Amino acid sequence: MMSYLKQPPYGMNGLGLAGPAMDLLHPSVGYPATPRKQRRERTTFTRSQLDVLEALFAKTRYPDIFMREEVALKINLPESRVQVWFKNRRAKCRQQQQSGSGTKSRPAKKKSSPVRESSGSESSGQFTPPAVSSSASSSSSASSSSANPAAAAAAGLGGNPVAAASSLSTPAASSIWSPASISPGSAPASVSVPEPLAAPSNTSCMQRSVAAGAATAAASYPMSYGQGGSYGQGYPTPSSSYFGGVDCSSYLAPMHSHHHPHQLSPMAPSSMAGHHHHHPHAHHPLSQSSGHHHHHHHHHHQGYGGSGLAFNSADCLDYKEPGAAAASSAWKLNFNSPDCLDYKDQASWRFQVL
């Protein structure tokens, strides 16, 4: 502000010029008549108009264009006003129902919000695995932040959160991180291997949410993966990738998660691979080859950079033949969801996702 004030001469003059010039232009554009086009006058309905509108509303809450036009002619208002009136009237109805029914819808909303929070948390690294994770929330729980991956890892790689992740792609990823989440996730992922296998568990969860899976895979890195896998967010892939890169290395060793590796190196490129990988993991858990899972984890973890990459790809591929394609898909994030589904135990995947 100060600097502007100090240069009134220049600034002001410039502005002054601009102002008048603009004014001059606007008139030709009809400026005077409509000084502010953005705001329309508030439409006031007469009682008779309201009666007509309410009568139609009683008949149908969603009148089609023909009905709206007919009413618009009757009451002398543009059809767009009629449309807006119905939109507002429906909103009013919903509000009344809500307050009447004692905020039934709110709880649901709240749930989702935790999920969202999860996302946040994952970013923040808070390790908040929302209980939400159980259902869609499962991913939310996964949401326990991936940031906390280390903790999660310590926790035993609460990979299960992955499942949650699947649900909430991003958050899920986060959740994935949280061991707590894991439980929920893992439960859903029937594969919830023992916690030690949490990673696998994750996997299984992952499987379910491949993306989540990815997350799981990322298990430690669920977050990133989850995001990627979940891709639900859309930015997940990159996310994972960055996540992977970043967190992976740190958590990786400790986590031992195969995910890390995926996350890490493969993340971006391998993101898909990672995803695939996840899938496979999921498989393992499914098969309950926790040992297997673990192996994978270690494997990744050790070679997580190069090996992981190869692994990812390979594994992914293995697990889901279409892996290659999937991989690229995964890459896209898309792949996560669809591919994962396809490749993965679809059933579990789907289940998770749904």
From Swiss-Prot:
| Region feature Disordered, mapped onto this chain | 91-146, 257-305
One GO molecular-function entry: DNA-binding transcription factor activity, RNA polymerase II-specific
Source organism superkingdom: Eukaryota
Which SUPFAM superfamilies does this one have?
Answer: Homeodomain-like (SSF46689)
Please list the residue ranges that the record marks as compositionally biased, kind Basic residues: 274-284, 291-302
User: What SMART domains does the record point to?
Assistant: HOX
Instruction: Specify the cross-link site (Glycyl lysine isopeptide (Lys-Gly) (interchain with G-Cter in SUMO2)).
Output: K344
Q: Does the keyword Ubl conjugation apply?
A: yes
Q: In which tissues is it expressed?
A: Expressed in brain. Detected in the anterior part of the neural fetal retina (at protein level).
GO cellular component entries: chromatin; nucleus
Which compartment or compartments is the protein found in?
Nucleus
Keywords assigned by UniProt? Developmental protein, DNA-binding, Homeobox, Isopeptide bond, Nucleus, Ubl conjugation
Coarsely, its chief localization is nucleus
Q: Which GO terms describe its biological process?
A: anterior/posterior pattern specification; diencephalon morphogenesis; inner ear morphogenesis; metencephalon development; midbrain development; positive regulation of transcription by RNA polymerase II; regulation of transcription by RNA polymerase II
The entry sums up its family as follows:
Belongs to the paired homeobox family. Bicoid subfamily.
Q: What does this protein do?
A: Probably plays a role in the development of the brain and the sense organs. Can bind to the BCD target sequence (BTS): 5'-TCTAATCCC-3'.
Could you identify this protein by its name? Homeobox protein OTX1
Q: Which organism is it from?
A: Homo sapiens (Human)
